């Protein structure tokens, strides 16, 4: 009786959800992060830096940002300042209150609410090392009244030795250095972080993090202000103690990453420099070589400093050169990569706050790399160089970048045999790549970037073994010949095909619903196929996704594509 009742409920549920899905064809539907294949957390995805953008402009671009595969958006600082609208005034705040040309608190709340609909996370740049004023320590006239106490600043004069750790954390780097050991300063910053969190912010980027001390140096700032439920990473340019001994810098980096992620500028700069010089470098990382996990590191092809500062060097590189560097860095396992939306001007004094930057982030090559990154979460990695190309092999696909050429035929190593044998489509150019157990061969298009898409994969054909027939006894009747059935190669499975019949039908949705009601048991292979939205579990949403596909909505890109099995 119980099973009969459950069966009736399943039938009603199936009919109802299918009718709803079909009727929705004529209505606008709100996509989710799963529809775009975005990572579930900031730490697993890549970041679009909307440098100087108004929050309202970011909000309007959210559909394109999600479609381009960016899990997170990083805004410029939202703290008040008293300067003009040149970009660098955003990094000279007067205190810890929200509201400047970028947007208001209400604008931030509106952005975060809308971003949630797309599965996009919001990261806000926070300036907590210093406030506005002079390099001699004088305060700007508009410093918030409650911050106008000498005890809240270090008052040690200007930094003159950038290889001296004491100077770096206690002296002014152009503006009065906050006393980040002071309990009131800590409480103000912590309160500001919580205000951002309450508005819906998911993460914090800590400006000038290397100029803020650590517990081993008598400063409990980071353990006190960070919210463990938010994403946190800090700007550490070059090394924490400049050109000091490697042992000193290594110790500091490891301590920073006990609390926050950090930028790996040395590795990022090496890769971008190699693209600039049209050469191969064999480095696989910088801070990872001392044991720091890649999940604690942020890479970039360029940053707002390398582009917008007076001595910024990447402003002299083309967007395509930056894209090639980004493709290498953003396809790496576990780490996050930041992509700068370049401002319209490269002149330090002509970059205006609130001006929307380049939308090149929507380009096919950038989006393809992001989708690859998201599809490869949790997958193994092997990197190397061959045939004057950088090669990043992942467990199911690869990214190949030429630093010097385009429109070339290449053969590179299938490093560690991670990429399954078969034929793949390059998601950038649409060309084909053939993969054997040892080699990857194909044509890199005009961008110099190829993304061997794990979701556009035809497995190499397999040949069934030939078994010699066993002679039947004379007295026995002659057996009819047995013909082996034609099956899909065991090395792949079609997403959505929960009954493993090679097609997507309403039966697949029904089978998922029956498994949820414990009326049937899915095999391990069928379970992989049943996870239609690829969120790591089987729920009623998977059945609904298939029904929507059959109704013509097709918002879940994975359905009908192949992935490797096992």
Label each region the model flagged.
Residues 4-23:
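Sec-dependent N-terminal signal peptides of Gram-positive bacterial secreted proteins and lipoproteins
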Residues 20-23, 465-566:
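Cellulosome-associated attachment modules in secreted, modular CAZymes
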Residues 25-46, 59-66, 77, 84-91, ...:
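Active-site-proximal helices and loops of the catalytic beta/alpha 8
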Residues 38-45, 79-113, 143-179:
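Aromatic- and acidic-residue-enriched carbohydrate-binding clefts of CAZyme catalytic domains
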Residues 46-56, 175-187:
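Active-site mouth loops of central-metabolism enzymes
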Residues 135-153, 219-235:
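A short alpha/beta connector and helix-capping loop motif
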Residues 443-464, 491, 559-566:
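A recurrent domain-boundary module in secreted/ectodomain proteins
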């Amino acid at each position: 009786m119980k099973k009969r009742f459950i069966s009736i409920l399943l039938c009603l549920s199936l009919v109802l959800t299918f009718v709803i899905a079909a009727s929705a064809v004529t209505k606008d539907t709100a996509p989710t992060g799963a529809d775009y294949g975005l990572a579930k957390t900031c730490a697993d995805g890549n970041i679009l830096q909307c440098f100087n953008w108004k929050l309202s402009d970011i909000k309007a671009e959210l559909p394109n940002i999600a479609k381009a595969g960016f899990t997170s958006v990083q805004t410029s600082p939202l703290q008040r300042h008293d300067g003009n609208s040149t970009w660098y005034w955003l990094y000279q705040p007067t205190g810890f209150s929200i509201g400047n040309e970028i947007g208001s608190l209400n604008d931030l709340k509106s952005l975060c609410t809308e971003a949630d609909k797309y599965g996009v996370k919001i990261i806000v740049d926070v300036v907590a090392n210093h406030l506005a004023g002079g390099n001699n320590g004088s305060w700007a006239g508009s410093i918030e009244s409650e911050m106008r106490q000498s005890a809240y600043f270090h008052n040690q004069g200007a930094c003159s030795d950038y290889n001296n750790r004491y100077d770096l954390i206690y002296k002014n780097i152009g503006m009065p250095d906050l006393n980040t050991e002071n309990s009131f300063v800590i409480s103000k910053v912590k309160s500001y972080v919580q205000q951002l969190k309450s508005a819906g912010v998911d993460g914090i980027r800590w400006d000038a993090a290397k100029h803020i001390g650590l517990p081993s140096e008598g400063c409990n700032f980071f353990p006190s202000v960070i919210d463990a439920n938010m994403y946190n990473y800090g700007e550490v340019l070059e090394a924490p103690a400049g050109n000091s001994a490697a042992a000193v810098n290594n110790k500091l980096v490891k301590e920073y990453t006990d609390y926050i992620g950090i930028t790996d500028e040395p590795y990022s700069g090496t890769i971008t420099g190699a693209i600039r010089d049209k050469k191969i470098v064999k480095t696989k990382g910088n801070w990872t070589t001392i044991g720091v996990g890649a999940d604690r590191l942020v890479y970039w092809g360029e940053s707002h400093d390398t582009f917008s500062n007076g001595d910024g060097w990447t402003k002299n590189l083309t967007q395509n050169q930056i894209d090639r560097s980004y493709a290498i860095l953003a396809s790496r396992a576990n780490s996050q990569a930041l992509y700068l939306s370049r401002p319209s001007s490269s002149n330090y004094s002509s970059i205006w706050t609130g001006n929307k930057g380049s939308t090149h982030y929507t380009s096919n090559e950038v989006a393809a790399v992001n989708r690859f990154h998201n599809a490869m979460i949790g997958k193994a990695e092997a990197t190397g160089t061959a045939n004057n190309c950088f090669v990043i092999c992942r467990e199911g696909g690869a990214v190949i970048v030429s630093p010097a050429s385009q429109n070339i035929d290449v053969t590179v190593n299938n490093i560690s045999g991670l990429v399954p044998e078969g034929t793949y489509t390059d998601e950038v150019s649409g060309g084909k790549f053939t993969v054997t157990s040892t080699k990857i061969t194909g044509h890199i298009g005009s961008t110099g970037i190829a993304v061997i898409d794990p979701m556009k994969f035809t497995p190499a054909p397999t040949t069934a073994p030939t078994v010699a027939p066993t002679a039947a006894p004379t007295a026995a009747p002659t057996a009819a010949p047995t013909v082996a059935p034609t099956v899909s190669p065991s090395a792949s499975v079609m997403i959505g095909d929960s009954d493993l019949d090679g097609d997507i039908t309403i039966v697949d949705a029904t089978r998922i619903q029956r498994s949820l009601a414990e009326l049937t048991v899915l095999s391990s292979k069928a379970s992989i196929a049943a996870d239609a939205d690829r969120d790591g579990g089987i729920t009623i949403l998977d059945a609904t996704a298939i029904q929507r596909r059959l109704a013509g909505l097709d918002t879940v890109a994975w359905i009908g594509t192949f992935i490797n099995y096992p």
